[in-house]
Amino acid sequence: MTSSNDKKTIKIAIVAGEKSGDELGAPLMHFLKANHPNIEFIGVGGPRMISEGLNSFFEMSEISVMGIIEPLLNLRRLLKLRKSLKGFLERENPDIFIGIDSPDFNIPVAKFLKNKLDIPTVQYVSPSVWAWRKGRVKSMEKCIDQVLTLFPFEKRAYSDSTIDVCYVGHPLAYSCLLYTSPSPRD
């Protein structure tokens, strides 16, 4: 019989580009550690993910941009950071890549890792392909193995694709279950 200390360490590359991604990533990391104690997390994340053991390559705030104008104004810096991250992850040779939200940043990283290292890739939070840029699903098929969705209806957007889709739910729904309101009679 082998102990958990004898098992291979799994190196997970995980990247969140904004606060909401950090809030999704930390519980995921906690769950993964509880089920497999020999995990090393590398990538980019915020304080919650770092507290779960992430070795963050750079501060998440470096890539946290919103809207249309802010990314354009920071495009050169964002591309340089993404290139540096790709090099770091290639050298680290992770067993799997998990991109959390931020699809315009994470999907090119997943594509690079899929082509270079041929590792499994996961996108946690589906891009809004059900609303716009529906053609993106076809390009995602080339580099994303699994999408974890927050809403059950999102799975339909992938019905004609080879991407495995898993509905995991929205964390707000779970937190609402913790706080039940009193009945009107109380």
Predicted regions, residues:
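An aromatic- and histidine-rich active-site surface loop
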Residues: 49-51, 97-114
